[in-house]
């Protein structure tokens, strides 16, 4: 096993894929766990592999290379990875030339321990060096030993790498990586590093390239998007970036995730309200409604500030759909603390919430805190929270019945579309809408009247119109001729030493 640290300067040049059959390129599959940033990075991993000569494996065939892009936020992330690795062991025994690579946050955290626990893994790479993957795969193949390379600092911004996007009509655009916050439950800053911001011009050029390729919607990504600009000393940079997105011809929808309440300022609210293609949607993590718990979480805002932001957003954008993240059972949480969380949920009237039972993560301050809440108490509170969230989400969705909305048709959003003879997509406020099937293509825009509501979706049995778009044209073109990769920039590669 080879372990390379952040001082290593080996080449990251893209090498051709080698395989047992010279007449057949090696195939790959990328499996992604975790957040939107991981989805973004997985598209870059796929782009790197395709630039190196690999081709995407068909769904019904075992891949020559399987890459896991992992998450480390919750305890079950470990179990999920090692469970999947265990399932691949007999496959690899039957197919010795198969290679398995593990990247992402869990790889950054566990490093060589992954190979010790699963010695059939060929490559381990971290969050700071995804550009090295093709070289590491080739080196592992030639050396017949695992290659473990973890760096402690980012050298190549992932957004400059080749990309194989999953969607032709919507795209992730990273505006920053890393995080300067120190939430006591979160391990991400230690794995992704401190915040580093891309320059606005680079971001806007990437978006313009995406739009030229047919994209209608972009989602701006960062661990804390509204602290964007701290790296180059402009506290209003995020609001300026939103307004600049409004000047790009052909860009119909702009979203962003995730902001931090501490940095949510009036200039951002004004930019959201005054930029027509910034969608009336906000996902802003609450985590807890108790000031005492927020203090222990080191969240640097309190209940009333959070509710005040919600009020100001709704005053400027009355139709905004607001969603959130909530953790139940944080160490020391009392029944009174939990009641404060329920109170915020009732007052904020979220359109939806991602709810989590607190998961102890080794290496975080919260893992060492006293007064860990018993699992049965956590489970009871979690069930009560979910029931309230779903009740309010249903009521908020029922208020949408009768409204006419434009839906960007999506691919794969509705699991039951085939049996219900419906298609699915997203309204401007990001609500999921299932509508009566038409000849619309993914990427087209349909105008529908909402006829029914459920906690997690809207149903529209009345389709009023279909607008064919260049995004739909791009989807149709990709379906007929599957491209080998989509380049959004030239890789910034280090020379061989």
Swiss-Prot record:
GO MF annotation list: 4 iron, 4 sulfur cluster binding; metal ion binding; N6-isopentenyladenosine methylthiotransferase activity
E.C. code: 2.8.4.3
Keyword Cell membrane listed: no
Major subcellular location class: cytoplasm
Binding-site positions, [4Fe-4S] cluster 1: 35, 71, 105
Residue ranges constituting the Radical SAM core domain according to the UniProt record: 165-395
UniProt cross-references to PROSITE patterns, sorted A to Z: MTTASE_N (PS51449), MTTASE_RADICAL (PS01278), RADICAL_SAM (PS51918), TRAM (PS50926)
InterPro entries assigned: Elp3/MiaA/NifB-like_rSAM, Methylthiotransferase, Methylthiotransferase_CS, Methylthiotransferase_N, Methylthiotransferase_N_sf, MiaB_methiolase, rSAM, rSAM_horseshoe
UniProt region (Disordered), positions on chain: 1-26
Pfam name, any one: TRAM
Keywords assigned: 4Fe-4S, Cytoplasm, Iron, Iron-sulfur, Metal-binding, S-adenosyl-L-methionine, Transferase, tRNA processing
Domain annotation MTTase N-terminal: ranges: 26-142
UniProt superkingdom: Bacteria
Function: Catalyzes the methylthiolation of N6-(dimethylallyl)adenosine (i(6)A), leading to the formation of 2-methylthio-N6-(dimethylallyl)adenosine (ms(2)i(6)A) at position 37 in tRNAs that read codons beginning with uridine.
UniProt subunit comment: Monomer.
Protein name, as recorded: tRNA-2-methylthio-N(6)-dimethylallyladenosine synthase
Gene: miaB
